[in-house]
Amino acid sequence: MSESPDFADFVRCQSSALLRSAWLLTGGDWALAEDLVQTALSEVWKRWERISGMEAPDAYAHKVMVNTFLRWRGRRWTGEIASARIPETGAVAGGFGQVDTRESLRRALRELTARQRAVIMLRYFEDRSEAETAAIMGCSVGTVKSQSAKALARLRHVPGLAEVLTGGSTC
């Protein structure tokens, strides 16, 4: 069965945005993010005739991806191994501040629960409302608010991220 030209165009236009969101959901694991996008797009493709007529098929694809991720978290081992040793997070001389911040963010995202990561990605990366986030995740607005508050509180305690979250200088 060959894919329709419309679906190929959809994938070409949406795959980068889906991959960026998936990277955040997976805590910075590119390989797992690619698997997540591929799985979500295969689900979208199965229903493409119905989905292509929707007002926002990209929103549907994001919803499929988030729900797939939340299902995976219950049964997949991602290779993450907890460590009692806290890594150094101090700035490295030579202009690597952005790399340090990105690495701090990646580690911090892995410390969040899957639901907290999904809320942070939908609310602050994709700039969705609380109601939209709740609809995508299949939960109440109150759950979105509480998960968001808990996640942000955890992220504020990560060295190197406090300045980013509060808008201060990272230098």
Please describe what each predicted stretch is.
Residues 1-9, 19-39, 49-55:
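Short, charged helix-capping/linker segments at alpha-helix termini
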Residues 2, 75, 81-110:
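Acidic, proline/glycine-rich intrinsically disordered inter-domain spacer in sigma factors
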Residues 6, 152-171:
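C-terminal edge and immediately downstream basic/flexible tail or linker adjoining helix-turn-helix-like DNA-binding
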Residues 9, 104-113, 155:
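Short amphipathic alpha-helical boundary/capping segments
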Residues 35-42, 46, 55-67:
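Structural recognition of an alpha-helix C-terminal capping motif at a helix-to-coil junction
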Residues 49-53, 63-84, 97-98:
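Arg/Lys-rich amphipathic alpha helix in sigma70-family domain 2
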Residues 66, 137-161:
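DNA-recognition helix of helix-turn-helix
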Residues 119-123:
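A short pre-motif secondary-structure segment
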